[in-house]
Amino acid sequence: MAGDPTAAMEDYKLLQLETATVDAQAPPLPTKTVPVFAPPLSTPPQPNELVYTKRRRTKRKAKCRCLFFTMGMFALGVLMTTAILVSTFILTVPIGALRTAPCPAETFGLGDECVRPVLLNASSNTRNISGVGAVCEEYSEMAASNGTAGLIMSLLDCLNVGDSESVMNKLNLDDTQLAYCNVPSFAECYTKGFGVCYAARPLSPLGELIYKARQALRLDHIIPFPR
């Protein structure tokens, strides 16, 4: 048996078989795994995602257009309402409400008019209405009738009776000839006559603005606005 090659071959095979059996029964040795970070691959969008993105963009554009349209209509409505209110005020405001400026010097206000008492020469022909009109033209004013002038002068006399302060001073007439005639010792006034001139009260700054607006719109022939 010592020199038999067949027996040696069989012993070698048995040794390999035993070694394989031991390796199979032994527990596996732990192995260390090293993580490998790889960038994610870009996947092409699916057809459903493309449709959803297009719909979202369309809705966003529609919302923006709707917002701009709403804001534009709101601004247009505000402008139209303001224009209507301003036009209505310009066309319907009463004239008396715009004549709030104080009367000029040497005059006093009676309602919407500014009244100016004037002295007339009795020797001349200035006591009639035409003569008073000539005097009033110097002030660019109109002459009141004799009855109206008499009532106004009587009113001034009544206001001045029993008052320590001159009515002429209160009415801004203290520097006129009429104020001097209020003194009884001033005999020259007995040869004078009295007349009354009047004019419309001046317009306030708002009245001037509305008057110019009506002139610009050429509405004077439709809605009279005497100065």
Swiss-Prot record:
The chain crosses the membrane at residues 66-86. Pfam families: UL45 (PF05473). Glycans are attached at residues 121, 128, 146. It is found in: Virion membrane. Keywords: Glycoprotein, Membrane, Signal-anchor, Transmembrane, Transmembrane helix, Viral envelope protein, Virion. Residues 87-227 are virion surface. GO terms for cellular component: membrane; viral envelope; virion membrane. Signal peptide: none annotated. It comes from the Viruses. It is a single-pass type II membrane protein. N-glycosylated. Residues 1-65 are intravirion. Belongs to the herpesviridae HHV-1 UL45 family. This is Envelope protein UL45 homolog.
